[in-house]
Amino acid sequence: MSGHSKWATIKHAKGAADAKRGQLFTKFIKEISVAARMAGGDPQANPRLRTAILKARAANMPKDNIERAIKKGTGELSGSSYEELVYEGYAPGGVAVLVEVLTDNKNRAAANVRNLFSRNGGNLGSAGSVSYMFNRKGVIEYDSEQVDEEALMELALEAGAEDIQNAGGVLTVTTVPGTFETVLESLQAKGWESLSAGISMVPDTYLALDEETARKVLKMIDRLEEEEDVQAVYSNADIPSELVL
């Protein structure tokens, strides 16, 4: 499995899913709250909120948590106000890295992300330094042993998927952002449980790494994803399969 598989990176970085569930839910709460604050608490009229809720549900986040997050965003309940930031830079080996942040303290987030880059052999760059290497895509991933591959491919394409790939036992469905929700809802209706689902930054090309460099890159991604304010980390690293399984 290559490192550009989002699930592979998350699987390696997060370890046991149950141990990190609270941290994951915290990220969903921030995203849902921000989406509701920006465009209202009605998912049908707010595509970003609708997508955030779909992601939370895919991770089995309780309905009550979702509803509270929406109310915090709309102001019905008190809560922090979050700012969206994107940091760009390089990991060891020249790997391009994008870090998406939601924070209630911009200075804290900037200092922490910068320190994590420098302490792990990376370099934080300026805006635009690596983002041109990525495109925003909808990405949905499934364990190929848990779904009917032929049926999934047929349904996904009918619903508007752009591409479906099977690598290392993971089926990756790629969409343009505009069809992500339609495709995900169609697949969810079949009862298939995804490994991950969301709007991701997908690199145009991937950078192959030797084992030593790959370990350094994965360590850096680990540390970034563990940071409280970090919502997502994307890279163009192609990780050797033995390091992510």
Swiss-Prot record:
Family annotation (InterPro entries): Integrase-like_N, TACO1_YebC-like_2nd/3rd_dom, TACO1_YebC_N, Transcrip_reg_TACO1-like, Transcrip_reg_TACO1-like_dom3, YebC-like
Domain of life: Bacteria
One GO CC term on file: cytosol
Listed Gene3D superfamilies: 1.10.10.200, 3.30.70.980
Pfam families: TACO1_YebC_N, Transcrip_reg
Chief location of this protein within or outside the cell: cytoplasm
Location of this chain's protein in the cell: Cytoplasm
HAMAP family, A to Z: Transcrip_reg_TACO1
Protein name: Probable transcriptional regulatory protein TP_0474
Organism: Treponema pallidum (strain Nichols)
